Swiss-Prot record:
It comes from the Bacteria. Residues 1-22 are annotated as: Disordered. One of its GO terms (cellular component) is cytosolic large ribosomal subunit. This is Large ribosomal subunit protein uL16. Keywords: Ribonucleoprotein, Ribosomal protein, RNA-binding, rRNA-binding, tRNA-binding. NCBIfam families: rplP_bact.
Length: 139
């Protein structure tokens, strides 16, 4: 699972989910990628599940890059607890993903295989996504 090694503050405010991604909106490392179309919190378990779905489909052929990291703790109070007495304990780690953000990248496989592998990964994620190709710069 992906979690930070060390954090300055154990509990944080919830990040805003509004707006669009400022950076990380293009495929940089690989040839193909998954781009978010909606805002969402993606947990470390969802990231790992998507990674496994992709790597099992491409087998030994390609290379996978994960371009998001779950660096935000989300807290939760125990069930049937009265309100008050402080913020709950950290329950899971999330990455705050905004629309336009490329989350996974893939290279070294033919396009039909990449499209199917990324489609399987999209089913593991909590938002609508789309398949994107690397843009070729003409100079």
């Amino acid at each position: 699972m992906l979690i930070p090694r060390k954090v300055k503050h154990r509990k944080q405010h919830h990040p805003k989910r509004s707006g669009v991604a400022k950076g990380g909106t293009r495929v940089v490392f690989g040839e193909y990628g998954i781009q978010a179309l909606e805002p969402a919190y993606v947990t470390n378990r969802q990231i790992e599940s998507a990674r496994i779905a992709m790597t099992r489909h491409i087998r030994r052929g390609g290379k996978v890059w994960i371009t998001i990291f779950p660096d935000r703790p989300l807290t939760k109070k125990p069930a049937e607890t009265r309100m008050g007495s402080g913020k709950g304990s950290p329950e899971w780690w999330v990455a705050n993903v905004k629309p336009g953000r490329v989350m996974f990248e893939l290279a070294g496989v033919p396009e039909p295989v990449a499209r199917e592998a990324l489609r399987r990964a999209m089913h593991k994620l909590p938002m609508k996504c789309r398949f994107v190709r690397r843009e070729v710069e003409v100079s």
